[in-house]
């Protein structure tokens, strides 16, 4: 009965206690041996020290055995035992418990278990979704922090240049609409051209400008204006007009170079 209740035998418990005590005893003997070996008498009388330690160990073992024999007897008689007169009065566990259940109660219990399982599945799915959202939010937060770190220098611009940020922002917002309408009108008014054709035209005009800028310095601003206009509008009509002007200018330069 005791073994079934305690899940170990009483003798094994007593043996464990005695073994722990013997281990402490041997540690104490080793400590005494180490202390004597560090004294000045260790080299003069090593044999006497060894004999004294042996007698000390035997004495301790005999004392432990004598007292723990009494401990074993007392434990088995008074702790791990019960009086014989109590045998007829021990109540069996669960003897008066009613485990009967009706069909309605069984069905209600099954229904409750099913509902709890469905709720658990929903909660677990919600938990997975929330974890995924949290992971994405953390990634976005990290990315935003990197971008903020890159543009952190903008916070010092108003202080260094004494710019009134609210008024400047309002002005930029007002001009943004006008700029969008202007770009839209330019795109609608300009015919679509290939970028390669425009690049070739620009290269040709730049070479013509280099040839004409040296002998005719007063035309420098004129051709610079037309080149910047061509690069900004990319209009074939403007390119053709400038091309005609260059041809006429080349003819004029040819006439002036003749003697």
Swiss-Prot record:
Coiled-coil ranges per UniProt: 123-156
Q: Name one GO cellular component term.
A: condensed chromosome, centromeric region
UniProt KW keywords: Cell cycle, Cell division, Centromere, Chromosome, Coiled coil, Kinetochore, Meiosis, Mitosis, Phosphoprotein
Identify residues that carry Phosphothreonine.
192
Q: Which Pfam families match?
A: Mis12 (PF05859)
- List localization entries: Chromosome, Centromere; Chromosome, Centromere, Kinetochore
Instruction: Describe the task this protein carries out.
Output: Acts as a component of the NMS (Ndc80-MIND-Spc7) super complex which has a role in kinetochore function during late meiotic prophase and throughout the mitotic cell cycle. Required for correct segregation of chromosomes and for maintaining the inner centromere structure.
Instruction: Give the record's subunit note.
Output: Component of the NMS super complex which consists of mis12, mis13, mis14, ndc80, nnf1, nuf2, sos7, spc7, spc24 and spc25. Interacts with dis1, mal2, mis14, ppe1 and ekc1.
Q: What PANTHER family does UniProt report for this protein, alphabetically?
A: PROTEIN MIS12 HOMOLOG
Q: What is this protein called?
A: Centromere protein mis12
Q: Which organism is it from?
A: Schizosaccharomyces pombe (strain 972 / ATCC 24843) (Fission yeast)
The encoding gene is: mis12
């Amino acid at each position: 009965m005791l073994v079934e209740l305690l899940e170990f035998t009483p003798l094994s418990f007593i043996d464990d206690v005695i073994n722990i005590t013997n281990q402490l005893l041997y540690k104490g003997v080793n400590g005494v041996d180490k202390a004597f070996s560090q004294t000045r008498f260790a080299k003069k009388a090593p044999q006497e020290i060894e004999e004294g330690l042996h007698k000390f160990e035997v004495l301790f073992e005999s004392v432990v055995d004598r007292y723990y024999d009494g401990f074993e007897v007392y434990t088995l008689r008074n702790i791990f035992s019960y009086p014989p007169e109590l045998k007829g009065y021990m109540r069996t566990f669960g003897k008066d418990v009613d485990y009967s259940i009706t069909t309605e109660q069984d069905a209600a219990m099954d229904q409750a278990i099913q509902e709890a399982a469905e709720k658990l599945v929903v909660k677990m799915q919600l938990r997975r979704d929330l974890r995924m959202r949290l992971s994405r939010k953390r990634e976005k937060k990290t990315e935003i922090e990197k971008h903020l770190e890159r543009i952190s220098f903008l916070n010092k611009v108003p202080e260094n240049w004494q710019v009134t940020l609210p008024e400047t922002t309002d002005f930029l917002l007002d001009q943004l609409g006008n700029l969008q309408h202007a770009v839209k009108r330019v795109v609608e008014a300009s015919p679509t051209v290939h970028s390669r054709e425009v690049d070739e035209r620009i290269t040709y005009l730049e070479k013509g400008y280099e040839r004409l800028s040296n002998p005719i310095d007063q035309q420098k601003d004129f051709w610079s204006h037309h080149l910047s206009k061509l690069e900004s509008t990319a209009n074939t009509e403007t390119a053709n007009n400038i091309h005609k002007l260059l041809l006429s200018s080349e003819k004029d330069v040819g006439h002036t170079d003749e003697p």
